[in-house]
Amino acid sequence: MKTQTTWIASLLIAAVGQTGAFAQDIRVDMNKVYPEKTIRLDEVASVRYIPLGTTDDVLFNGKIVHLSDEGIAGFNKKEGDILVFDGAGKVVGSFNHLGQGPQDYPQIYHLDVDWKQGEVYVQDNFRQKIRIYAPDGTYLRTLNSQGTMREGDMYHYSDTHLIYYKNPDGRQFAPYQPVTLFSKKDGSATFLPFTKTDENIVKATGGPFGDMKLNAKHVSSLYKLGDEVYVNEVTADVIYRIEKSDALTPLVQRTPSYQEAVGKDYFLVITGANARYYFFKRQQALLEFKGNAATDTKSTFVAYDRKQKSILQPTFIHSDYPSLNITLDKLKQCAGSSNRCFLLMEAFKLKEALAEGKLKGTLQSIAEKLHEEDNPVLMVIEFKK
Protein backbone atom coordinates (compact mmCIF):
# COMPACT_ATOMS: atom_id res chain seq x y z
CA MET A 1 0.00 0.00 0.00
CA LYS A 2 2.87 2.37 0.81
CA THR A 3 4.40 1.72 -2.61
CA GLN A 4 1.09 2.38 -4.37
CA THR A 5 0.55 5.63 -2.44
CA THR A 6 4.06 6.83 -3.31
CA TRP A 7 3.51 5.96 -6.98
CA ILE A 8 0.23 7.92 -7.15
CA ALA A 9 1.92 10.89 -5.48
CA SER A 10 4.65 10.81 -8.12
CA LEU A 11 1.98 10.99 -10.82
CA LEU A 12 0.54 14.08 -9.16
CA ILE A 13 3.95 15.73 -9.20
CA ALA A 14 4.33 14.93 -12.91
CA ALA A 15 0.89 16.32 -13.71
CA VAL A 16 0.94 19.59 -11.83
CA GLY A 17 4.49 20.18 -10.84
CA GLN A 18 3.64 20.10 -7.14
CA THR A 19 1.68 18.04 -4.67
CA GLY A 20 -1.39 19.48 -3.00
CA ALA A 21 -4.09 18.37 -0.63
CA PHE A 22 -7.29 17.09 -2.19
CA ALA A 23 -10.20 19.49 -1.75
CA GLN A 24 -12.34 16.54 -0.62
CA ASP A 25 -11.77 12.82 -0.19
CA ILE A 26 -13.65 11.63 -3.28
CA ARG A 27 -12.60 8.33 -4.84
CA VAL A 28 -14.52 6.75 -7.70
CA ASP A 29 -14.08 3.02 -8.30
CA MET A 30 -14.16 2.56 -12.06
CA ASN A 31 -15.26 -1.09 -11.88
CA LYS A 32 -17.72 -0.99 -8.99
CA VAL A 33 -21.48 -1.24 -9.48
CA TYR A 34 -22.83 1.54 -7.28
CA PRO A 35 -26.35 1.35 -5.79
CA GLU A 36 -29.26 2.80 -7.74
CA LYS A 37 -31.59 5.27 -6.05
CA THR A 38 -34.69 7.23 -7.10
CA ILE A 39 -34.66 10.78 -5.71
CA ARG A 40 -37.49 13.32 -5.72
CA LEU A 41 -36.22 16.65 -6.98
CA ASP A 42 -38.79 18.38 -4.77
CA GLU A 43 -36.76 17.20 -1.75
CA VAL A 44 -33.24 18.15 -2.89
CA ALA A 45 -33.66 21.03 -5.37
CA SER A 46 -35.75 23.93 -6.56
CA VAL A 47 -37.11 23.71 -10.11
CA ARG A 48 -38.24 26.38 -12.55
CA TYR A 49 -38.90 26.53 -16.28
CA ILE A 50 -37.63 28.83 -19.02
CA PRO A 51 -39.48 28.59 -22.36
CA LEU A 52 -37.04 29.73 -25.04
CA GLY A 53 -38.57 32.40 -27.23
CA THR A 54 -39.65 31.43 -30.72
CA THR A 55 -39.81 33.61 -33.84
CA ASP A 56 -39.74 32.83 -37.56
CA ASP A 57 -35.99 33.51 -37.52
CA VAL A 58 -35.14 31.85 -34.20
CA LEU A 59 -35.59 28.09 -34.26
CA PHE A 60 -33.33 26.16 -31.91
CA ASN A 61 -32.34 22.55 -32.51
CA GLY A 62 -28.82 22.52 -31.16
CA LYS A 63 -26.80 22.82 -27.98
CA ILE A 64 -27.09 25.15 -24.99
CA VAL A 65 -23.60 26.23 -23.90
CA HIS A 66 -24.29 29.09 -21.46
CA LEU A 67 -27.01 29.49 -18.82
CA SER A 68 -27.05 32.34 -16.31
CA ASP A 69 -29.23 35.13 -14.92
CA GLU A 70 -27.73 37.44 -17.56
CA GLY A 71 -28.64 35.23 -20.47
CA ILE A 72 -28.67 31.95 -22.36
CA ALA A 73 -26.65 31.09 -25.45
CA GLY A 74 -26.60 28.16 -27.82
CA PHE A 75 -25.90 27.20 -31.41
CA ASN A 76 -27.12 24.98 -34.21
CA LYS A 77 -23.85 23.47 -35.40
CA LYS A 78 -25.01 22.15 -38.76
CA GLU A 79 -26.72 25.38 -39.83
CA GLY A 80 -24.21 27.74 -38.18
CA ASP A 81 -26.85 29.66 -36.21
CA ILE A 82 -25.94 31.37 -32.93
CA LEU A 83 -28.90 32.13 -30.66
CA VAL A 84 -28.83 34.47 -27.66
CA PHE A 85 -31.64 34.84 -25.11
CA ASP A 86 -31.98 36.87 -21.93
CA GLY A 87 -32.27 35.12 -18.57
CA ALA A 88 -36.02 34.70 -18.99
CA GLY A 89 -35.73 33.15 -22.47
CA LYS A 90 -36.60 36.23 -24.55
CA VAL A 91 -34.71 36.46 -27.84
CA VAL A 92 -31.84 38.96 -27.68
CA GLY A 93 -30.02 38.09 -30.87
CA SER A 94 -29.82 35.53 -33.64
CA PHE A 95 -27.08 35.53 -36.25
CA ASN A 96 -25.28 33.34 -38.72
CA HIS A 97 -21.80 34.18 -40.02
CA LEU A 98 -21.13 30.80 -41.57
CA GLY A 99 -18.81 31.41 -44.50
CA GLN A 100 -15.26 31.87 -45.72
CA GLY A 101 -14.89 35.63 -45.27
CA PRO A 102 -12.53 37.36 -42.79
CA GLN A 103 -15.43 38.01 -40.39
CA ASP A 104 -16.97 34.54 -40.75
CA TYR A 105 -16.55 31.09 -39.23
CA PRO A 106 -16.55 27.99 -41.48
CA GLN A 107 -17.90 25.92 -38.59
CA ILE A 108 -18.82 26.45 -34.93
CA TYR A 109 -16.78 24.28 -32.61
CA HIS A 110 -17.90 25.98 -29.40
CA LEU A 111 -18.79 29.39 -27.98
CA ASP A 112 -19.14 31.26 -24.71
CA VAL A 113 -20.36 34.69 -23.61
CA ASP A 114 -19.02 37.53 -21.47
CA TRP A 115 -22.16 39.50 -20.61
CA LYS A 116 -20.22 42.22 -18.81
CA GLN A 117 -18.13 42.97 -21.90
CA GLY A 118 -21.02 42.22 -24.27
CA GLU A 119 -19.00 39.70 -26.29
CA VAL A 120 -19.66 36.28 -27.82
CA TYR A 121 -16.52 34.18 -28.41
CA VAL A 122 -16.75 31.62 -31.22
CA GLN A 123 -14.18 28.84 -31.50
CA ASP A 124 -12.98 28.48 -35.10
CA ASN A 125 -10.55 25.57 -35.06
CA PHE A 126 -10.41 25.27 -38.83
CA ARG A 127 -8.47 28.53 -39.06
CA GLN A 128 -7.12 28.54 -35.50
CA LYS A 129 -9.07 31.71 -34.72
CA ILE A 130 -11.45 33.04 -32.10
CA ARG A 131 -14.16 35.19 -33.69
CA ILE A 132 -15.71 37.80 -31.42
CA TYR A 133 -19.19 39.26 -31.93
CA ALA A 134 -21.70 41.33 -30.01
CA PRO A 135 -24.81 39.43 -28.81
CA ASP A 136 -26.77 40.92 -31.73
CA GLY A 137 -24.25 39.47 -34.21
CA THR A 138 -22.20 42.59 -34.92
CA TYR A 139 -18.63 41.57 -35.77
CA LEU A 140 -16.06 42.98 -33.32
CA ARG A 141 -12.65 41.41 -33.94
CA THR A 142 -10.65 38.20 -34.48
CA LEU A 143 -7.83 36.75 -32.40
CA ASN A 144 -5.31 34.13 -33.48
CA SER A 145 -5.23 31.17 -31.11
CA GLN A 146 -1.84 29.89 -29.97
CA GLY A 147 -2.10 26.47 -31.62
CA THR A 148 -5.14 24.27 -32.17
CA MET A 149 -7.75 24.20 -29.41
CA ARG A 150 -9.56 21.01 -28.49
CA GLU A 151 -13.10 21.08 -29.80
CA GLY A 152 -15.47 22.41 -27.14
CA ASP A 153 -12.69 23.23 -24.67
CA MET A 154 -12.78 27.06 -24.77
CA TYR A 155 -14.52 29.34 -22.25
CA HIS A 156 -14.86 32.86 -20.91
CA TYR A 157 -12.60 32.85 -17.83
CA SER A 158 -12.30 36.41 -16.50
CA ASP A 159 -12.76 40.03 -17.54
CA THR A 160 -9.43 39.87 -19.34
CA HIS A 161 -8.93 36.26 -20.42
CA LEU A 162 -10.42 33.24 -22.10
CA ILE A 163 -9.26 29.75 -21.17
CA TYR A 164 -8.82 26.86 -23.57
CA TYR A 165 -7.18 23.46 -23.83
CA LYS A 166 -4.49 23.28 -26.49
CA ASN A 167 -3.99 20.22 -28.64
CA PRO A 168 -0.46 18.78 -28.88
CA ASP A 169 1.79 20.05 -31.65
CA GLY A 170 2.66 17.50 -34.31
CA ARG A 171 1.48 13.94 -34.80
CA GLN A 172 3.72 12.34 -32.19
CA PHE A 173 2.51 13.01 -28.67
CA ALA A 174 5.01 14.54 -26.25
CA PRO A 175 4.39 15.99 -22.76
CA TYR A 176 3.32 19.65 -22.88
CA GLN A 177 1.35 22.35 -21.02
CA PRO A 178 -2.14 22.52 -22.56
CA VAL A 179 -4.21 24.74 -20.23
CA THR A 180 -3.99 28.19 -21.77
CA LEU A 181 -5.07 31.60 -20.48
CA PHE A 182 -5.66 33.71 -23.58
CA SER A 183 -5.83 37.50 -23.56
CA LYS A 184 -9.09 38.90 -24.93
CA LYS A 185 -7.23 42.08 -25.88
CA ASP A 186 -4.14 40.99 -27.79
CA GLY A 187 -4.25 37.19 -28.00
CA SER A 188 -1.17 36.64 -25.85
CA ALA A 189 -1.05 33.27 -24.09
CA THR A 190 -0.01 32.11 -20.63
CA PHE A 191 0.19 28.40 -19.85
CA LEU A 192 -0.82 27.13 -16.42
CA PRO A 193 1.74 24.89 -14.67
CA PHE A 194 0.04 21.65 -15.62
CA THR A 195 1.83 19.08 -17.77
CA LYS A 196 -0.13 16.57 -19.81
CA THR A 197 1.75 13.31 -20.08
CA ASP A 198 -0.63 11.08 -22.05
CA GLU A 199 -3.57 11.24 -24.43
CA ASN A 200 -7.09 10.82 -23.09
CA ILE A 201 -9.11 10.11 -26.17
CA VAL A 202 -11.77 7.54 -26.92
CA LYS A 203 -10.90 5.07 -29.68
CA ALA A 204 -13.10 2.86 -31.84
CA THR A 205 -12.33 -0.38 -33.65
CA GLY A 206 -13.85 -2.00 -36.70
CA GLY A 207 -14.76 1.18 -38.53
CA PRO A 208 -15.20 1.49 -42.30
CA PHE A 209 -11.72 3.05 -42.48
CA GLY A 210 -10.12 0.94 -39.77
CA ASP A 211 -9.47 1.86 -36.16
CA MET A 212 -9.78 5.55 -35.35
CA LYS A 213 -9.69 8.20 -32.65
CA LEU A 214 -13.00 9.88 -31.95
CA ASN A 215 -13.60 13.56 -31.34
CA ALA A 216 -14.01 15.47 -28.09
CA LYS A 217 -17.74 14.82 -27.67
CA HIS A 218 -16.80 11.70 -25.69
CA VAL A 219 -14.00 13.01 -23.47
CA SER A 220 -13.24 16.71 -23.14
CA SER A 221 -10.19 17.77 -21.18
CA LEU A 222 -11.51 21.13 -19.95
CA TYR A 223 -14.97 21.73 -18.53
CA LYS A 224 -16.63 24.88 -17.29
CA LEU A 225 -19.51 23.93 -15.02
CA GLY A 226 -21.30 27.05 -13.84
CA ASP A 227 -18.49 29.46 -13.04
CA GLU A 228 -15.87 26.84 -12.13
CA VAL A 229 -13.37 25.22 -14.52
CA TYR A 230 -12.24 21.60 -14.22
CA VAL A 231 -9.40 19.66 -15.85
CA ASN A 232 -9.49 15.92 -16.55
CA GLU A 233 -6.12 14.18 -16.50
CA VAL A 234 -6.33 10.42 -16.95
CA THR A 235 -2.61 9.80 -16.59
CA ALA A 236 -2.59 11.08 -13.01
CA ASP A 237 -6.02 9.55 -12.32
CA VAL A 238 -7.18 12.91 -10.99
CA ILE A 239 -9.74 15.59 -11.85
CA TYR A 240 -8.58 19.10 -10.93
CA ARG A 241 -10.46 22.31 -10.20
CA ILE A 242 -8.86 25.59 -11.31
CA GLU A 243 -9.06 28.12 -8.49
CA LYS A 244 -9.54 31.87 -8.90
CA SER A 245 -5.82 32.24 -8.20
CA ASP A 246 -5.16 30.05 -11.30
CA ALA A 247 -3.85 27.26 -9.03
CA LEU A 248 -4.99 23.69 -9.67
CA THR A 249 -6.52 21.78 -6.75
CA PRO A 250 -6.92 17.98 -7.00
CA LEU A 251 -10.58 17.18 -6.42
CA VAL A 252 -11.36 13.58 -7.38
CA GLN A 253 -9.25 10.45 -7.63
CA ARG A 254 -10.14 7.31 -9.55
CA THR A 255 -9.27 3.72 -8.70
CA PRO A 256 -7.87 1.51 -10.07
CA SER A 257 -5.30 3.63 -11.84
CA TYR A 258 -5.53 4.12 -15.59
CA GLN A 259 -1.93 2.92 -15.64
CA GLU A 260 -3.04 -0.54 -14.47
CA ALA A 261 -4.43 -3.13 -16.88
CA VAL A 262 -7.67 -3.36 -14.84
CA GLY A 263 -8.15 0.40 -15.12
CA LYS A 264 -7.77 1.01 -18.85
CA ASP A 265 -11.34 0.21 -19.88
CA TYR A 266 -12.81 3.54 -18.74
CA PHE A 267 -12.04 7.25 -18.43
CA LEU A 268 -13.44 9.30 -15.55
CA VAL A 269 -15.17 12.50 -16.71
CA ILE A 270 -16.83 15.15 -14.55
CA THR A 271 -20.20 16.23 -16.01
CA GLY A 272 -21.76 18.25 -13.21
CA ALA A 273 -20.90 20.18 -10.04
CA ASN A 274 -23.47 21.71 -7.73
CA ALA A 275 -24.19 22.36 -4.06
CA ARG A 276 -25.32 18.78 -3.40
CA TYR A 277 -23.63 16.51 -5.98
CA TYR A 278 -20.73 15.95 -8.29
CA PHE A 279 -21.77 14.04 -11.41
CA PHE A 280 -19.38 11.76 -13.29
CA LYS A 281 -19.35 9.64 -16.40
CA ARG A 282 -17.31 6.46 -16.54
CA GLN A 283 -16.62 6.65 -20.25
CA GLN A 284 -15.95 3.46 -22.17
CA ALA A 285 -12.46 3.90 -23.64
CA LEU A 286 -12.71 1.52 -26.59
CA LEU A 287 -15.88 1.55 -28.69
CA GLU A 288 -16.88 -0.70 -31.57
CA PHE A 289 -18.42 0.30 -34.87
CA LYS A 290 -21.78 -1.13 -35.87
CA GLY A 291 -22.35 -0.06 -39.44
CA ASN A 292 -21.09 3.52 -39.72
CA ALA A 293 -21.63 4.44 -36.06
CA ALA A 294 -19.48 3.81 -33.00
CA THR A 295 -21.60 2.28 -30.25
CA ASP A 296 -21.20 3.08 -26.57
CA THR A 297 -22.87 0.34 -24.53
CA LYS A 298 -20.85 0.23 -21.32
CA SER A 299 -20.45 3.84 -20.15
CA THR A 300 -22.21 4.62 -16.87
CA PHE A 301 -23.00 7.72 -14.83
CA VAL A 302 -22.60 8.10 -11.07
CA ALA A 303 -23.03 10.88 -8.52
CA TYR A 304 -21.09 11.74 -5.40
CA ASP A 305 -23.48 12.98 -2.70
CA ARG A 306 -21.59 15.77 -0.92
CA LYS A 307 -23.96 15.66 2.06
CA GLN A 308 -24.07 11.89 2.57
CA LYS A 309 -20.46 11.40 1.33
CA SER A 310 -21.48 8.41 -0.76
CA ILE A 311 -21.57 7.42 -4.44
CA LEU A 312 -24.74 6.26 -6.19
CA GLN A 313 -26.50 5.94 -9.54
CA PRO A 314 -29.44 8.34 -9.16
CA THR A 315 -32.63 8.74 -11.13
CA PHE A 316 -34.46 11.99 -10.40
CA ILE A 317 -38.22 12.47 -10.65
CA HIS A 318 -40.37 15.59 -10.24
CA SER A 319 -43.98 16.16 -9.26
CA ASP A 320 -44.74 18.17 -12.44
CA TYR A 321 -43.88 15.17 -14.64
CA PRO A 322 -44.01 12.07 -12.39
CA SER A 323 -43.49 9.52 -15.17
CA LEU A 324 -40.30 11.17 -16.47
CA ASN A 325 -37.12 9.50 -15.24
CA ILE A 326 -34.31 12.07 -15.27
CA THR A 327 -31.05 10.16 -15.48
CA LEU A 328 -27.59 11.74 -15.49
CA ASP A 329 -27.10 11.23 -19.22
CA LYS A 330 -30.07 13.58 -19.78
CA LEU A 331 -29.19 16.15 -17.12
CA LYS A 332 -26.83 18.82 -18.47
CA GLN A 333 -24.67 21.58 -17.06
CA CYS A 334 -22.74 24.24 -18.94
CA ALA A 335 -20.94 27.52 -18.38
CA GLY A 336 -22.81 30.29 -16.59
CA SER A 337 -24.23 30.57 -13.09
CA SER A 338 -23.03 28.04 -10.54
CA ASN A 339 -25.28 25.31 -9.14
CA ARG A 340 -27.55 25.08 -12.18
CA CYS A 341 -28.30 21.97 -14.17
CA PHE A 342 -30.94 21.76 -16.86
CA LEU A 343 -33.03 19.42 -18.91
CA LEU A 344 -33.89 20.39 -22.48
CA MET A 345 -37.58 19.58 -23.05
CA GLU A 346 -38.75 19.70 -26.66
CA ALA A 347 -42.10 21.38 -27.26
CA PHE A 348 -43.67 18.59 -29.32
CA LYS A 349 -42.80 16.03 -26.65
CA LEU A 350 -44.36 18.22 -23.96
CA LYS A 351 -47.52 18.50 -26.08
CA GLU A 352 -47.61 14.71 -26.38
CA ALA A 353 -47.17 14.32 -22.62
CA LEU A 354 -49.90 16.91 -22.04
CA ALA A 355 -52.32 15.03 -24.30
CA GLU A 356 -51.57 11.83 -22.39
CA GLY A 357 -52.30 13.49 -19.04
CA LYS A 358 -48.73 13.13 -17.77
CA LEU A 359 -48.10 16.77 -16.79
CA LYS A 360 -49.09 18.65 -13.66
CA GLY A 361 -48.60 22.03 -12.02
CA THR A 362 -46.47 24.72 -13.61
CA LEU A 363 -45.21 22.51 -16.43
CA GLN A 364 -48.77 21.65 -17.44
CA SER A 365 -49.65 25.36 -17.61
CA ILE A 366 -46.61 26.07 -19.78
CA ALA A 367 -47.31 23.15 -22.12
CA GLU A 368 -50.89 24.31 -22.64
CA LYS A 369 -49.56 27.53 -24.20
CA LEU A 370 -46.99 25.86 -26.47
CA HIS A 371 -47.16 25.00 -30.14
CA GLU A 372 -45.44 21.84 -31.31
CA GLU A 373 -42.98 23.85 -33.44
CA ASP A 374 -41.93 26.14 -30.59
CA ASN A 375 -38.42 26.20 -29.19
CA PRO A 376 -37.65 23.94 -26.21
CA VAL A 377 -38.38 24.62 -22.57
CA LEU A 378 -35.48 24.49 -20.12
CA MET A 379 -36.17 22.74 -16.84
CA VAL A 380 -33.65 24.52 -14.59
CA ILE A 381 -32.63 22.65 -11.45
CA GLU A 382 -30.82 24.29 -8.54
CA PHE A 383 -29.73 21.76 -5.93
CA LYS A 384 -29.80 22.51 -2.20
CA LYS A 385 -26.87 21.83 0.12
Regions found by a protein language model. Give the residues of each.
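Asp-box/WD-like beta-propeller blade repeats and closely related beta-sheet repeat scaffolds
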Residues: 125-178, 191-207
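Blade-loop segments of beta-propeller domains
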Residues: 53-57, 90-117, 124-125, 147
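Beta-propeller blade signature
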Residues: 135, 176-186, 237-240, 293-308, ...
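Conserved blade-ending motifs and adjacent loop-strand segments that build the rim/top face
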Residues: 249-269, 307-338
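Blade/loop signatures of beta-propeller domains
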Residues: 24-50
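Short coil/turn segments at the loop-to-beta-strand junctions that recur within blades
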Residues: 56-57, 96-104, 144-151, 195-200, ...
